[in-house]
Amino acid sequence: MDNFGFLKVAAAIPHLRVGDCDYNAERMAAMAEEAARRGVEIAAFPELGVTAYTCGDLVLQSTLLDAADEALERLVRATRKLPLTLIAGAPLRHGSALYNCAVVFTQGKVLGVVPKTYIPNYGEFYENRWFASGAGISDEHIAVAGQQADFGADLTFEVNGAEFGVELCEDLWSAAPPSSQLALNGAKVIFNLSASPEAAGKHAYLRQLVAQQSARTIAAYIYCSAGFGESTTDLVFAGNGIVAENGTILREAERFSPEEQLVVADVDLERLAFERRRNTSFRMNEGATENTVIEMEIPEGLRGVVLDRDIDPMPFVPKDEAHRSERCEEIFRIQSHGLAQRMIHTRAGKAVVGISGGLDSTLALLVTARTFDFLKMDRAGIIGITMPGFGTTDRTYNNALELMRGLGVTIREIPIRDACTQHFRDIGLDPDDRGAAYENAQARERTQILMDVANMEGGLVVGTGDLSELALGWATYNGDQMSMYGVNASVPKTLVRHLVKWAADTERDAATRATLLDIIDTPVSPELLPADAEGKIAQKTEDLVGPYELHDFFLYNFLRAGYGPAKILLLAEQAFEGSYDRATILKWLTVFVRRFFTQQFKRSAMPDGPKVGSVSLSPRGDWRMPSDASAAAWLREVEEL
């Protein structure tokens, strides 16, 4: 299991006939063959799929139980040449009791049998009438499919390095699901064989339950429930198939479909292992109880280059418009509350913000305005300073002024050309030398102005730099890298644009809305080099360091998922198919890796700022990294691509 840590799993929902074990086994065998063709490595069928769930008292009859045993044995034999592991539901006799079981088998060998722990006997459920609970069963063996196999509720399995566990239907709905302990015992994938009937409103709760359990266990959770063919005497089974991973639903079946369904997804075991390593609370309970681990190596099946998994090219930005709007509102609240507390603590009566007419300073000013409203302070106490330099264009200059007017803040204009020209003379820099000193001197001059005005006014300098700039080190050390409180420090550039768009959409003043929309359409630039012959922006950030949508994708997957360059490239190729080719992605991935390591010294000295999402580079919080760490291993991996 070395396919970048991905494991292809499936919930297989076959047509069933109640009590017709031969037919049911045939359908399951056919679906197993289809799963193998699609490269599935582990597939689960519904609860009691060999007999069907709705047999009622017939399940106590020896005739049906014998037929189930024989059909299960044929199913194990029929799939013995397939390179995948299967999990089928069947009623099995053990001692004097009958158990509702999940049978795990591969290559003609039964690896183990897991009995259902929680036997529901309420509402429409009467399972206690037929089945015994598997609670407490451990270290036992059971006769199944002509073999002797391990039998117990505590079994975990490891096939080709992929660790998984099994529970059945009601087990998930209980206060202490067996899957929680299975996960603590090492299972990164949980399969649930279910036969859960429909009821109005129940499906939404089921989705939440599956997603939540996958999050709580930091695992992949594959839920496979009975569908077409179960008896509708009193109940309806819609055929729910859900694949979730650490709180996110990856794939779902079509409910109430008359067709057989194979719900396939690639789950990311590498990501799950990373999350468990970083989650100290999870580690505190690992291995708390002893359990039986059954290991097996089997030939690998077909593997496709394209993953059965949606790869989000914008991982920081919610896809759904309603969710995105809600997220933007929440982020603004976090930013403004963070700034409000800092202003109260420092007794700052005013805020000073450098306004360039670009996205970041616009967001910082919007946050500051909300902060003053929250504190019931006059927005006139916000001092917005525009500082035209050698590269300032009419478009950004006018947008800066219009934005400040629209928000009702105090406007100051302090050009920096003369001060920088004098500074160039003082240090002996030829103004025609447009290197780092030429650019950075302007950024530091602006920061000096902001700091000095803040001292004069008893105010606080609000920083504008964003998370993407911090990751790339695209900021002047002790220039725009420095402030007294950085409200955008954990907001990536791709999200900044959406936050400003949300502000525009909720802005009542038409002129201010128009200004915000034009700022969104303006190319990202530090404007430290002179404009072109037409007075337009000549220095475009994304031409120099690469597209921010790529860098934010790299950043999220590097930090939040712990991936290396090879896996990030694989995912980026799929996420940005049709937008960027492999060579382009690899070029900017190399830039990202190199700059991320070499620019850590700027992050080590970054000012305070609020964390707003799952990724932050604060050296006091989420990211602890020495400024002189070597990037050799990561760059070597890039070079090998």
Task: Show which residues each predicted segment covers.
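Enzyme catalytic cores with a strong preference for nitrogen-chemistry domains
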Residues: 1-354, 370-379, 411
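ATP/NTP-dependent adenylation/nucleotidyl-transfer catalytic domains that generate, transfer
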Residues: 19, 24, 160, 219, ...
